[in-house]
């Protein structure tokens, strides 16, 4: 039996796919840079070997699954080609893997990971379901009927998939290093829609998705009355959100989610619509929606001292706005401080004013240096260009996060798609030292 070797196994999709193959009984290993990523924890728990990149890792008997970030000139891929080993790109392998299942591809400019996680949680509790989530989580469930997968639009990679269903959460202009306009993004989504076998579930409140022209049913969901599935009577509370769902103007049921913001209501509504279409019992769907704890790096909360620290993947103006609004809902009486690390120079330059406008919805704003990508390590702007447009003109360094101590009782949002987690980790150490220092002070005062 072949051994599957993943080139770039710590990538979020690659990590999830490796776990799926492992669960299905295949022998799996992989390689990556010698740096810790949160995605490797699950790999280590399943005892999947992780090596540092080296041509010496490549031997006879391997099938190479190559991450899309690595060119054919990568040393491991070059060696594999020299040896005549099968080399297949991540998205193409996944496209082959989902055949034979009732597959559900979740795509959209924003909300893919959260919606894939929610769908996997709900459907997986009702029917056997395999899933691949963009937070690095994957499961190859035995005798699975359904396969839920996050489908990324970047470089049109999702066109390798021909799923049974697709959920389209929204269309927005992102990845400006590849997509030239929102029309370019729309064309990619419509092309995917033409490959879907049974039906597309699309946000009807999105003017771009309303333009879809397909030969299969398009089931629209949203807040507007013309949608086939409509969320009404939304009640936002500090413990979550409640809402009613109407199907073709007839009451379906009332639902409750332990999540915040309109975007999470819409994510849940897409799942409700698909489950109803597939005939899954509404009471079971209601039960599972109430117990979803979220996905990694999506409004992940840590309480430290009197502050609330939130880790979030938000890296586009629309996502920052949604994250700030969610914080306002859950913590209406707290000050909101945004700590943001822009991801890629092209995105930062393209959406500079949009980033400023979204960040300024917070009470205070701190900016980290721009995180470059493997394809784009430098650019013709700096973080100062964005800082000049935001509240306070604050730039924060990893070694000086103690500035955030100025906001006792605040919610501090650490946002970005790069390595902004290291800023949160540094600040947590500052907070831990504060506790120790105060404890020592009390002891000396007593003595």
Swiss-Prot record:
Keywords: ATP-binding, Cell cycle, Cell division, Cell shape, Cell wall biogenesis/degradation, Cytoplasm, Ligase, Nucleotide-binding, Peptidoglycan synthesis
PANTHER family from the UniProt entry: UDP-N-ACETYLMURAMATE--L-ALANINE LIGASE, UDP-N-ACETYLMURAMATE--L-ALANINE LIGASE-RELATED
E.C. designation(s): 6.3.2.8
HAMAP family on file: MurC (MF_00046)
A Pfam family recorded for this sequence: Mur_ligase_M
Residues that, per the record, bind ATP: 108-114
Principal localisation: cytoplasm
Organism: Listeria welshimeri serovar 6b (strain ATCC 35897 / DSM 20650 / CCUG 15529 / CIP 8149 / NCTC 11857 / SLCC 5334 / V8)
Domain of life where this protein originates: Bacteria
GO CC terms in record: cytoplasm
Record's keyword annotation contains Ribonucleoprotein: no
Name of the protein in question: UDP-N-acetylmuramate--L-alanine ligase
BP GO terms, sorted: cell division; cell wall organization; peptidoglycan biosynthetic process; regulation of cell shape
One MF term in the entry's GO annotations: UDP-N-acetylmuramate-L-alanine ligase activity
Similarity field: Belongs to the MurCDEF family.
Task performed by this protein: Cell wall formation.
Reaction catalysis annotation: UDP-N-acetyl-alpha-D-muramate + L-alanine + ATP = UDP-N-acetyl-alpha-D-muramoyl-L-alanine + ADP + phosphate + H(+)
Pathway: Cell wall biogenesis; peptidoglycan biosynthesis
Catalytic class of the enzyme: ligase
Gene3D superfamilies documented for this protein: Mur ligase, C-terminal domain (3.90.190.20), Mur-like, catalytic domain (3.40.1190.10), NAD(P)-binding Rossmann-like Domain (3.40.50.720)
UniProt keyword annotation of Nucleotide-binding present: yes
Intracellular or extracellular location(s): Cytoplasm
């Amino acid at each position: 039996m072949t051994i599957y070797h993943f080139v770039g196994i710590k990538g979020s999709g690659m990590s999830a796919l490796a776990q799926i193959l492992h669960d299905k009984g295949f022998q799996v290993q992989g390689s990556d840079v010698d740096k810790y990523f949160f995605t490797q924890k699950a790999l280590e728990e399943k005892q999947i070997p992780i090596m540092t990149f080296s041509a010496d890792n490549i031997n006879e008997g391997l099938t190479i699954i190559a991450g899309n970030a690595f060119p054919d000139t990568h040393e491991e891929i070059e060696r594999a080609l020299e040896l005549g080993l099968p080399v297949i790109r991540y998205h193409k392998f996944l496209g082959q893997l989902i055949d034979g299942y009732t597959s559900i591809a979740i795509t959209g400019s924003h909300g893919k990971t959260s919606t894939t996680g929610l769908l996997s949680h709900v459907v997986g509790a009702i029917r056997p379901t395999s899933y691949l989530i963009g937070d690095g989580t994957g499961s190859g469930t035995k005798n699975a009927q359904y396969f839920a997968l996050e489908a990324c639009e970047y470089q049109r990679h999702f066109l390798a998939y021909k799923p049974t269903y697709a959920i389209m959460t929204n269309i927005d202009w992102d990845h400006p290093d590849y997509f030239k306009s929102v029309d370019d993004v729309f064309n990619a989504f419509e092309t995917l829609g033409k490959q879907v076998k049974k039906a597309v579930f699309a946000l009807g409140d999105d003017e771009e998705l309303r333009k879809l022209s397909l030969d299969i049913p398009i089931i629209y969901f949203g807040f507007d009355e013309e949608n086939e599935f409509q969320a009404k009577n939304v009640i936002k509370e500090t413990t979550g959100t409640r809402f009613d769902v109407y199907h073709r103007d007839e009451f379906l049921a009332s639902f409750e989610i332990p999540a915040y913001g309109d975007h999470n209501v819409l994510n849940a509504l897409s799942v409700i619509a698909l489950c109803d279409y597939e005939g899954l019992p509404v009471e079971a769907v209601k039960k599972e929606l109430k117990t979803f704890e979220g996905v990694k790096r999506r409004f992940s909360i840590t309480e430290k001292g009197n502050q609330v620290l939130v880790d979030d993947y938000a890296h586009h103006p629309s996502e920052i706005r949604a994250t700030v609004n969610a914080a306002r809902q859950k913590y209406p009486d707290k000050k909101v401080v945004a700590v943001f690390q822009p991801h890629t120079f092209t995105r930062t330059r393209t959406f500079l004013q949009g980033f400023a406008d979204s960040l300024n919805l917070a009470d205070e704003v701190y900016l980290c240096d721009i995180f470059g990508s493997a394809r784009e390590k430098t650019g013709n702007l700096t973080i100062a260009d964005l800082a000049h447009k935001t509240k306070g003109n604050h730039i924060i360094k990893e070694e000086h996060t103690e500035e955030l101590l100025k906001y006792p009782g605040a919610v501090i949002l650490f946002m970005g798609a790069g390595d902004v987690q290291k800023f949160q980790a540094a600040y947590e150490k500052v907070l831990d030292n504060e506790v120790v220092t105060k404890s020592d002070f009390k002891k000396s005062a007593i003595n």
